Amino acid sequence: MKAELCQFCLRSGILCSKCRAKLERGEVTRLDLEIARLLVSIEDKYPLLQDVYFHGAVEADNILAILVRRGDANKILSYGGKIIRFLEDKTGKSIRILEYNTNERKFLEDLFSPLSILTINKIWLPDGTVETRVILKGRKKSSLNVNAMREIAKRVRGITLRVEFAD
């Protein structure tokens, strides 16, 4: 697996001076380090992980969003979901795999998966801010934590979301 931190640091758990500096500057968080180490630990069991580029992780409420390079989400979702289950067991959180540097629609589809997005609109408010309205198909699902999804979208992409449901 490729990441912002070097392989030696991820495998050993001891940070070199370069990786320690990245952590101190805030380029990498403790959560990023923890998740990257978990992914590296199962790399031998799941060889597809060797080609995955891990960008970072964001946590909101009880949901953990893992950011990977465009096209790498399918590699983590493969193996019948065993990688996701492993991460959920180790972290105790619900896992979302999101692709970094994709268009806004793809990002939102991944974020709200398995629900379908009917429409996405931009709302320009009088104070000059912009909100993105997402209308999801179906009734409000109890399994979907809308506030956590808003928080993840804000931290990852800087998007302010307004989520609605329609039949």
PLM segments and residue spans:
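RNA-contacting regions in translation and RNA-metabolism proteins
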Residues: 1-167
